[in-house]
Amino acid sequence: MVKAVPTPEEIRAAHPMDKELQEIKAKRDAEIKKIFTGESDKFIAIIGPCSADYENSVLDYLCRLAAVAEKIKDKVFVIPRIYTNKPRTNGSGYKGMLHQPNPEDKPDFIEGVKAIRKMHIKAIRETGLTAADEMLYTDNWPYLEDILSCLLYTSDAADD
């Protein structure tokens, strides 16, 4: 069975960022810009595991990371690494939450997009931290562009 893939606009409308979270993201993005343009002498640290597969574990980790980030905020700007993709160069293997939200089930891109939007939104709400994620396919960016503060396009040769 072939399912129609919702547009990024449809997904964002179904799983929106509220105004408070939009303001948090705008503030953090402005701080990142200041760091990259030299207006701030802070150091950016993108910190976290290489894979975010289970929401509860991710949120537990992020709550602890937020406490550390608060202690060092005058010198270091922490961006949590919430990598929901596991890019593979040859196409086989587990590709992360985006493509397979439950590692025990079959791949489901639509449910994956919904799951990672919900997780990223919950992470911002609970910690005040906007995240970095990685992607292999540029077409996936519009589904998360209103949530993420940092994106890395990568290719992982783990299956080669």
Place the predicted regions along the sequence by residue.
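N- or domain-start disorder-to-order transition segments that initiate the globular core
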Residues: V2-F36
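Generic N-terminal targeting/processing segments that precede catalytic cores or assembly contacts
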Residues: I24-I35, E39-K42, S57-K71, V78
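Conserved, mostly hydrophobic/aromatic
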Residues: G48
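Short acidic, Gly/Ser-rich segments with clustered Asp/Glu that frequently serve as metal-coordination loops
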Residues: A52-D53
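A generic, well-ordered mixed alpha/beta core segment in the N-terminal half of proteins
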Residues: C63-N140
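Active-site phosphate/pyrophosphate-binding segments
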Residues: L144-L152
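Conserved small/polar residues in nucleotide/adenosyl-binding loops
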Residues: Y153-A158
